[in-house]
Every structure is written in structure tokens, then in C-alpha cells.
């Protein structure tokens, strides 16, 4: 819901895009759109054919759109998977890494938030993202950019599903979808 629309947007601006999908159907769908697609699974180590991995890492910039799960295999799995991807990119001398984080690193802060605003995550996934951001900022030999995304909605991400069965004590308080 994020990677494919981003890839298509970049391609419409003339960028060559190489990407990974976890299923062969996903790889074929990406290729049908003109994306140089390859299969890759995270367990949390990378499971990928060596030639495909070389193609995936032969890029000017690596964009990581792997979402931190609120439920699922767990925080350690996510942390290890992201670190495995980044370590592999560094071994392949990828010069630039763009990591999609979340405004959940700010916790329950309200008002206008800036990059320099204090991070105080209130969820396990927010804490893992904060730790990964810190780790990424300290990597030598590569340029790292971190985007803290919020409010991602679309055909497969309807806002109502995030609020179903929950009470909102303060209707004026910001929410992170």
C-alpha cells in the first residue's frame, strides 16, 4: 500500500525502480507495471537468490518501506529484519538509504511537531522505530534519510478501521493512523 504507489510515482518522474515483493504473484504484478521486481522474504534474515539480491542492491538509493507491525511476529523480528536489510545494503556499498518511520515515535505529543521535537514513543512499535532511527543515524559511510510518515490512507487503508471498537476520550487530540 506504500511501496507500489511510491514506485509508480517515481517511475512517472523518469526514475528506474527496482523492488522486492514477498510473493511470486507480487513480483509478476510489479514487473507488469515496469518495475524491475525480485522475490525477497524476511525471516528475519533475507531469503533471496544471490543474483536477485545483487540486482536489488545495485541501486543509487535504497528505500525501506517495511511497516512496523502493531501485531504479528514481534518487535525483535522487525528490528532484525530492518538491520539485515541495511547491513546487506552497506555490504553492497549502497550510498543512500531512505527509511520510512512513523510519527508514532513522538508518542502522545500534540501540537505542531518538528524533526527536532522530543521523541517519546508510547507503543512497542514506536519504541522500535525510535531505536532503529538512532541506529541508522550512527551508520558510517552512507547517507541516511528518515521520513516519519503519518495519516497514510488509501483504498486498502480506510481510516474507519483504525477506530473501530475504540473510544476517543478527546475528539480534539491528534491520532496516528
Residue ranges and their predicted role:
Residues 57-98, 131:
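NAD(P)-cofactor binding segment of oxidoreductase domains
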Residues 84-122:
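Conserved Rossmann-fold NAD(P)-dependent oxidoreductase catalytic core, especially the SDR/UDP-sugar
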Residues 75-79, 115-134, 175-177:
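Short-chain dehydrogenase/reductase
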Residues 158-177:
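A conserved pocket-lining segment of Rossmann-fold NAD(P)-dependent short-chain dehydrogenase/reductase
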Residues 102, 133-155:
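Conserved beta-loop-beta element that borders a ligand/cofactor-binding pocket
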